[in-house]
């Protein structure tokens, strides 16, 4: 089957990119590809059998027209000016059979006009982390970009140490970022901001294109998508680590996996990025930061969208987030209905978990085994203050009995939303260290495991992290 690529971005947004081709690596070789995703995209298996090829930027497929996008942004709350694709190149937009499209974005593809002081490269460590994280999030049901392939090489890349150069093929319906809009707003070119909005609506919100109120309705949906995404992050204990405006997707996708981390111990102020000295992007601050980012986007739209309409949409953010968050947390607790004591029970559990530094994922998974008429719980042994747990657990079982559903029905629901497996940093690190020595077994094994996060397991993927893995520090270095 011949893949079809189109050039909407190149043709319709001529001032938002520089056309250029990837710069191949030395002795590049394909070490992993996503068979399931490749099948979904109707990619012939033969493309993965002839060396690095397109996956290493050595060849282009018919119809591809590679380019690097320009955008700007706020980083750690401070205006950073022009940024752009400093190491990534959009190879093309694949047109799928259903009429939708998928960007093919090659990360680590070499120098671009937007590399600033960088070398345009990515390292094996960061490409493995992004591939694992994006696939883990996908199978958790959270909107995200996807990983299609990883290529490693003999090219040395200099970070804190010398690391192997690598490339990641990332795919997504769009790489539209909040920072694209900021770029032209701060250049005082509101007509180009509007052009971006029209492009987004035409291709991703086409049902609004003929509505006279399209900009307001579109921004309302961007707010809602962002609120929903952040709510989902919070329910699985995911910290992004670097929520700059240029790292946020207009479509509400999780984008740019750098110094991310999933909670081990329940620590509301968890900081996963060791460069985040002020805790701006701490786990518990993500909802507030996302609203701040939406406010920055609203500012760029203010020349052609009524400020009252923008503020009305922004005012809806908290309620949308709380609604999504509340629904999912009730499911995680096994509540089939909404009762007035639900929030108090959840907050009391969180207080107990924070005090005891309980493992976030394990606590909710073990809670899924609760039998409403039995005071016995395997979760009890996870707490030192047994009396405090017993008191909370008795009230929790009383709340379960209000819903009048069987244990099996409730447990099935809970186990479908409380994963047994999340991508803890130590699991990724173990796969990385093996891969850097030439052994890809753990990389493939972990990828396979992450496809079934809600299945019961009895291996170390679902055990408590070892001491060395609890406080792994991760930087933006990639």
From Swiss-Prot:
EC annotation?
2.7.7.-, 2.7.7.108
A molecular function annotated in GO for this UniProt entry is: AMPylase activity
Annotated positions binding ATP: 84, 86-87, 107, 119-120, 170, 177, 256
Record: active site: 246 (proton acceptor)
The residues listed in the UniProt record as binding Mg(2+), with positions renumbered to this chain, are: 247, 256
Does the record's keyword annotation contain Amino-acid biosynthesis?
no
Give the cofactors, semicolon-separated: Mg(2+); Mn(2+)
Alphabetized UniProt keyword annotations: ATP-binding, Magnesium, Manganese, Metal-binding, Nucleotide-binding, Nucleotidyltransferase, Transferase
From what superkingdom does this record's organism come?
Answer: Bacteria
Q: Is Manganese there in the keyword field?
A: yes
InterPro entries in the record: adnlytase_SelO (IPR054838), SelO (IPR003846)
Family matches, as NCBIfam families: adnlytase_SelO, PRK00029.1
Tell me the function of this protein. Answer: Nucleotidyltransferase involved in the post-translational modification of proteins. It can catalyze the addition of adenosine monophosphate (AMP) or uridine monophosphate (UMP) to a protein, resulting in modifications known as AMPylation and UMPylation.
What does the sequence similarity comment in the record state about its family?
A: Belongs to the SELO family.
What PANTHER family does this protein map onto? Answer: PROTEIN ADENYLYLTRANSFERASE SELO, MITOCHONDRIAL
Under what name is this protein listed? Answer: Protein nucleotidyltransferase YdiU
Species of provenance: Escherichia coli O157:H7
**The encoding gene:** ydiU
């Amino acid at each position: 089957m011949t893949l079809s690529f189109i050039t909407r971005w190149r043709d319709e947004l001529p001032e938002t990119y520089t056309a250029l081709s990837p710069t191949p690596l030395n002795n590049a070789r394909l070490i992993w590809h996503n068979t399931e995703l490749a099948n979904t995209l109707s990619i012939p298996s033969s493309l993965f059998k002839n060396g690095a090829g397109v996956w290493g930027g050595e060849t282009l497929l018919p119809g591809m027209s590679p380019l690097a996008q320009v955008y700007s942004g706020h980083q750690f709350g401070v205006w950073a000016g022009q940024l752009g694709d400093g190491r990534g190149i959009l190879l093309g937009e694949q047109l799928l059979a259903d009429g939708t499209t998928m960007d093919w974005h090659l990360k680590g593809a070499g120098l671009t006009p937007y590399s600033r002081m960088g070398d345009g490269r990515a390292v094996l460590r960061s490409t493995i982390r992004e591939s694992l994280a994006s696939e883990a999030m996908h199978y958790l049901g959270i909107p995200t970009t996807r990983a299609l392939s990883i290529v490693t090489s003999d090219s040395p890349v200099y970070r804190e140490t010398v690391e192997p150069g690598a490339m990641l093929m990332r795919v997504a319906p769009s790489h539209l970022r909040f920072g694209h809009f900021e770029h032209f707003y701060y250049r005082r070119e509101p007509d180009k901001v509007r052009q971006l909005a029209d492009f987004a609506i035409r291709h991703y919100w086409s049902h609004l294109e003929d509505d006279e109120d399209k900009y307001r309705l579109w921004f309302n949906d961007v707010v809602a998508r962002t609120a929903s995404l952040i709510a989902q992050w919070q329910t699985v204990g995911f910290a992004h680590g670097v929520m700059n405006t240029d790292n946020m997707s207009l479509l509400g996708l999780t984008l740019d996996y750098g110094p991310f981390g999933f909670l081990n111990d329940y620590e509301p102020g968890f900081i996963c990025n060791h460069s985040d000295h002020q805790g701006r992007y701490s786990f518990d601050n993500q909802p507030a930061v996302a609203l701040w980012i939406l406010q920055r986007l609203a500012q760029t739209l203010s020349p052609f969208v009524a400020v009252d309409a923008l503020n009305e949409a922004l005012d809806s953010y908290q309620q949308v987030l709380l609604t999504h968050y509340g629904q999912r947390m009730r499911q995680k607790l096994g509540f089939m209905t909404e009762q007035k004591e639900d929030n108090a029970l959840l907050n009391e559990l969180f207080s107990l978990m924070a005090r005891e530094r309980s493992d976030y994922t394990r606590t909710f998974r073990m809670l899924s085994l609760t039998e409403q008429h039995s005071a016995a719980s395997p979760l009890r042994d996870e707490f030192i203050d047994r009396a405090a747990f017993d008191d909370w657990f008795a009230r929790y079982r009383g709340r379960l009995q209000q819903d009048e559903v069987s244990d099996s029905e409730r447990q099935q629901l809970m186990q479908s939303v409380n994963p047994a497996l999340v991508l803890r940093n130590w699991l990724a690190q173990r796969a990385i260290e093996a891969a850097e020595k030439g052994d890809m077994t753990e990389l493939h094994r972990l990828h396979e495991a992450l496809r079934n996060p809600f299945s019961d397991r009895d291996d170390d993927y679902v055990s408590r992290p070892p001491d060395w893995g609890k406080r792994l520090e991760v930087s933006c270095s990639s």
